[in-house]
Amino acid sequence: METATVLIVFIASLLLGVTGYSVYTAFGPNSKDLRDPFEDHED
């Protein structure tokens, strides 16, 4: 494999991993513990 191909595969897998982790954090079982700053703010 060429160096560019390995680099592209690494960056793509890293991006997919970060995206998957953020979706799991936002909608997973621990999402009930997250606070909403818009609801905390009073007008």
From Swiss-Prot:
Give compartment(s). Plastid, Chloroplast thylakoid membrane
Q: Which residues form a coiled coil?
A: none
One GO biological process this protein is involved in is: photosynthesis
For membrane topology, the record states: Single-pass membrane protein
GO terms under cellular component: chloroplast thylakoid membrane
A Pfam family reported for this protein in Swiss-Prot or TrEMBL: PsbN
The alphabetical list of record keywords is:
Chloroplast, Membrane, Plastid, Thylakoid, Transmembrane, Transmembrane helix
Superkingdom of the source? Eukaryota
InterPro entries listed in its UniProt record = PSII_PsbN
Q: Where are the transmembrane segments?
A: 7-27
Extract the HAMAP family matched here.
PSII_PsbN (MF_00293)
The protein's job, in short, is: May play a role in photosystem I and II biogenesis.
Q: Which NCBIfam families match?
A: PRK13183.1 (NF009650)
Q: Which family does it belong to?
A: Belongs to the PsbN family.
Which protein is depicted? Answer: Protein PsbN
Organism field: Rhodomonas salina
Gene giving rise to this polypeptide: psbN
